[in-house]
Design a protein with these regions (language model features):
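Alpha-helical segment proximal to the catalytic Tyr-Lys
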Residues: 25, 70-74, 132
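Short C-terminal tail/terminal secondary-structure segment
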Residues: 46, 124, 135-150
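Substrate-binding pocket helix/loop in short-chain dehydrogenase/reductase
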Residues: 1-9, 104
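Residue(s) in the substrate-gating loop at a strand-loop-helix junction
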Residues: 41
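Active-site helix of classical SDR
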Residues: 20, 57, 65
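A conserved structural motif in NAD(P)-dependent oxidoreductases
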Residues: 108-119
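Active-site loop-to-helix junction immediately N-terminal to the catalytic Tyr of the SDR YXXXK motif
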Residues: 47-55, 67
Length: 150
């Protein structure tokens, strides 16, 4: 449906674009270095069925981030992407207990879901001076899932 497409693209891609554009404008105007991290998904790198708008939005976000990294590098503004795999949340916890959820878990090499805490260290790397030479990069945090079939 077109309405679903618009909602997903507006939320996942356009929303990130607007925030990153405003952040970069402010940093450039202040002549200040900085770091922008966009949150994509492994579904922006590999696809699966039934979520094509989401896959397109996240793939677009990865490519937008790479282009923005090129545009902003001369201002010492880094732009990177964090691409989580399947992360357990309150919203999806019940699904992972179903047969379908258990089958999906078997395709993750570590045989477990990620936890929100698993994203903290990679995010800190991208935001801090520890990652000062990283720009245009995507860090995938997925228990090896991207190496396997999705």
């Amino acid at each position: 449906e077109e309405e679903e497409w618009d909602t997903v693209i507006d939320t996942s891609l356009k929303g990130s674009y607007l925030v990153a554009q405003e952040m970069s404008r402010r940093l450039v105007a202040a002549k200040q270095a900085g770091s922008i991290v966009n949150i994509a998904s492994i579904l922006g790198q590999r696809v699966t069925s039934a979520v094509s708008p989401y896959c397109a939005a996240k793939a677009g976000l990865i490519h937008f981030s790479q282009a923005m990294a090129l545009e902003l590098a001369r201002y010492q503004i880094r732009v990177n992407v964090l691409a989580p795999g399947y992360i357990e949340t309150d919203m999806n916890r019940d699904f992972w207990l179903t047969d379908a959820g258990q089958q999906m878990l078997k395709r993750i090499p570590q045989r477990r879901l990620g936890q929100t805490d698993d994203l903290a260290a990679p995010l800190l790397l991208l935001l801090s001076d520890a990652g000062r030479y990283l720009t245009g990069s995507t860090i995938t945090v997925d228990g090896g899932h991207i190496c396997n079939s999705i």
